[in-house]
């Protein structure tokens, strides 16, 4: 949720952010109007309450007919107070509903436009060439080495489901373990998170549970399957006051993730690039507003460290405003080269959500003024970033393949596979 005080004082900044996202600017003026109505209703209520208190004292001192007359006025005034209270509550509700429709304020420097308007920050490594043989795609390789079974996945669960078996299962577990160990070495607390969450937790992270077609819902229990452990990790400290005296609070969550892929009909139908269920290690950070940008760069560096360990050529892109999720003020994606597609495909993303999620989830820290004196509380900043996920297998199999379909294991991964140097053809 955005800061209504900031919006009221700097409406042009929020209009510009909405324009950059391709979103409706008029909501900014609607919120300002709703805030004015809320303030007016609250003032009316408080004035009537004060008047009610005065009448209460008069009634206590009055006698006889005067007291009866005053009691009649008090009753009428009580009805007015009740109506004013309802009006103030309604104005507050309307304002909150409008605020929940506004995505996070975009950071300065984020590219304007949509999905194709990203800016390439840097490119690392060179896409592999195959002068001696025609490269196979990840599914063909996966079938040759007994790693991926899409046919039985579809038989058991439907389209976009799969089995990882044998070296495929081992490879995913190795990736996730390497990612988790790296996170722990960087000071993250490892977490195994719930994959079902309450609607208030899902909404708190910025998802629209009523209109988001990507989310699986268990209607009888009113619970939602998460598409990332970010959701559970964001809700972990809901309604709490955090202490950053020892620095940022960093968690690394491992979980299964679920996405309906409702808008992906016909896209990436072959293999495991776009699936309904996958596993992931997600980094999540709580920190101060002042430290958020620096933490964002650290998250990106940790993601790049994993890509380097996997010996994959990749690029980093600064995602355009119109392609940002509601919660993100800025997002960087790391995309690895997929040889048979002749394209870079996203393997990781990292987002700075500033105070957006924390305001929705009521996560705060104790504030101090310039003299170090306590001054109430304020919203914290939250950030997230992917460290490893099932999709990495796509790039690993294709980039490190041999002519016969076997796959060389990157050196850093070998110890997590019992020293295995090559994934052999069966």
Swiss-Prot record:
A single GO CC term for this protein reads: cytoplasm
Give TM regions.
Answer: none
Enzyme Commission designation: 6.1.1.11
Question: Where are stretches of biased composition, namely Basic and acidic residues?
Answer: 1-15
Q: Which parts of the sequence are annotated with region: Disordered?
A: 1-22
Q: Which InterPro entries match?
A: aa-tRNA-synt_IIb, aa-tRNA-synth_II, aa-tRNA-synth_II/BPL/LPL, Ser-tRNA-ligase_type_1, Ser-tRNA-synth_1_N, SerRS_1_N_sf, SerRS_core, tRNA-bd_arm
Q: Which residues bind ATP?
A: 259-261, 275, 346-349
Tell where it localizes: Cytoplasm
**Which superkingdom does the taxonomy of this entry point to?**
Bacteria
User: What UniProt keywords apply to this chain's record, in alphabetical order?
Assistant: Aminoacyl-tRNA synthetase, ATP-binding, Cytoplasm, Ligase, Nucleotide-binding, Protein biosynthesis
Give this protein's Gene Ontology molecular function annotations.
ATP binding; serine-tRNA ligase activity
Principal localization reads: cytoplasm
Q: What is known of its domains?
A: Consists of two distinct domains, a catalytic core and a N-terminal extension that is involved in tRNA binding.
Entry function: Catalyzes the attachment of serine to tRNA(Ser). Is also able to aminoacylate tRNA(Sec) with serine, to form the misacylated tRNA L-seryl-tRNA(Sec), which will be further converted into selenocysteinyl-tRNA(Sec).
- Please give the subunit comment from the record: Homodimer. The tRNA molecule binds across the dimer.
* UniProt name for this protein: Serine--tRNA ligase
Which species does this protein come from? Pseudarthrobacter chlorophenolicus (strain ATCC 700700 / DSM 12829 / CIP 107037 / JCM 12360 / KCTC 9906 / NCIMB 13794 / A6)
What lineage does UniProt assign to this protein's organism? Bacteria, Bacillati, Actinomycetota, Actinomycetes, Micrococcales
